[in-house]
């Protein structure tokens, strides 16, 4: 049977009992090694991925998995991690193995070694990996007869022994899982002798030659199993793809992402910094960054007012009891900063006259918003009640995961909590999702999909019935939006299911943006009520919603999305006057005054630098509009536009230039201005 290769392929194929999956794939005429869509594993009827060497006991229908799919790439990367580990133990025989899973766009492996790996070490390891790949070693699955056999074989690998004993634990550990303990041996293709092996549940590609293209990218320190109380290991990262072309494309993307890194641009553009004296994950915004942040907030504030939100403010710290009531201290304590014990009073001899109490920095604003709702009686006529706050919160993130503005310890959420009746819930969710998508679009993000996070069976509060009702409401609204919906089983917070709006940036990377979370639980815990139309007391439904997620994170994402070249309406400096010579400065200052009268953020560069150097500097600073003026411009009452793409419009009457800039900013154009896009009449 031959299966045509189409966008929807591969169709299921049959593997006869006693036959390898590889033979069935070959008989079906599906692509083999060397093709980007080569079949690397198959998926059986239970959803389990199987090696191509798998032989079913009875006839089985399987779905071939191609190398150029997410699942196929994951298998290739997992196999590449094994090749890396083999190379490390050959070149560094004292190395002890940690874990080596595939990750998004790549893989890593952790090693216990005496010294950190150097760039030269990575070059040597990559060279040895290429030799192993060229050898075509076979990946061979082997089942341990018992834990005792596994322990005996792995006696020299302490981290693997820990995984053997924790076999039923973490499902994300690639080494163990399922009903069996298994190893994968790398076999010499000629002699079939074992060359190297690793504790692993698989699956793997047939041979090392099925790794078409790979590269080691970097190394770093990492704690064993991500716990800072455990041993510090050395982690080597790499990436592997279905073709050299795909690898090259990915490496170019990495290079571009590094160029756009918001931490790098934040320093180069004088936007923000992270002083050591303040602490990890705590940013300070410089004047220019403060302008961008203010514009982000002010536009959002205006839109929220138009949409019927009421603004509130709450303190940064609160008594511990509030977080006992909310459940945060039961379910979220690890993400909170330690308590401050305050208000105790003592006699002169040290005897406690008045006991103190614990206060916490708030990790979330929602408990305080419930208190605002509860501060007086509420009627159904007041609902939906939409409370909104730019509220600064503090979360204890481990230092190893803090990452610039996108993963911080202190940040400001654009936090809203909506209280409505159950009858209003569906309509409120639908209008809320529309509002979120429209507002994100105003900032230039337009490529979205949705993620539905559902209950973690081991970490939730409230009844199953409440969770089911909330999940159904969110799923219905998501379906009505027409956007792709990706399930996230068990990914919800402890108090309710949520929809996350995922946005793709200019590089195609996905970022979690807005979250919309239904909560029947908080109204119960805080005993929130309203008087219904029939006079009875009813519980409202609560919706948690953060549109940006946090101002800081959104700032970082937009910085990378625009590569620092913010739209003119957000740019810290919207226009700059660049004189040909000093005598042209007064004229440009008069043009700047005209622009300032319209609210434009404009500067005139009166420095001693030559004009060409000024243009280079302000181009690097991503100023949207550069206005040049020399003798002819002054005589004609004109300016010349210069843009970041090096295009230019000469001899534009100053009033026309001012009008064009003011209109561009007022229209909130998100594209980069250029001679092609800016509509002005030239005086020449």
Swiss-Prot record:
- Domain of life of the native organism: Bacteria
Task: Give the E.C. number(s).
Answer: 6.1.1.3
Q: Which GO MF terms does the UniProt record name?
A: ATP binding; metal ion binding; threonine-tRNA ligase activity; tRNA binding
Using the UniProt record, name the top-level EC class of this enzyme in a single word.
ligase
Cofactor(s), by name: Zn(2+)
Question: What reaction is this protein's catalytic activity?
Answer: tRNA(Thr) + L-threonine + ATP = L-threonyl-tRNA(Thr) + AMP + diphosphate + H(+)
Catalytic: annotated span: 261-567
Q: Name one Pfam family in it.
A: tRNA_SAD
Spell out the PROSITE patterns in the cross-references. Answer: AA_TRNA_LIGASE_II (PS50862), TGS (PS51880)
The residues that the entry says bind Zn(2+) are 366, 417, 544
Question: How are cofactors bound according to the entry's free-text note?
Answer: Binds 1 zinc ion per subunit.
Where, subcellularly, is it found? Cytoplasm
- InterPro entries from the UniProt entry: aa-tRNA-synt_IIb, aa-tRNA-synth_II, aa-tRNA-synth_II/BPL/LPL, Anticodon-bd, Anticodon-bd_dom_sf, TGS, Thr-tRNA-ligase_IIa, Thr/Ala-tRNA-synth_IIc_edit
How is this protein annotated for GO cellular component?
Answer: cytoplasm
Residue ranges annotated for the TGS domain, each copy included: 1-66
One GO BP on record is:
threonyl-tRNA aminoacylation
**Keywords, in A-Z order:** Aminoacyl-tRNA synthetase, ATP-binding, Cytoplasm, Ligase, Metal-binding, Nucleotide-binding, Protein biosynthesis, RNA-binding, tRNA-binding, Zinc
The record's function comment reads:
Catalyzes the attachment of threonine to tRNA(Thr) in a two-step reaction: L-threonine is first activated by ATP to form Thr-AMP and then transferred to the acceptor end of tRNA(Thr). Also edits incorrectly charged L-seryl-tRNA(Thr).
Per the record, the similarity remark reads:
Belongs to the class-II aminoacyl-tRNA synthetase family.
Indicate the quaternary assembly.
Homodimer.
The name on file for this protein is: Threonine--tRNA ligase
Q: Which organism encodes this protein?
A: Mycobacterium avium (strain 104)
The gene designation is thrS
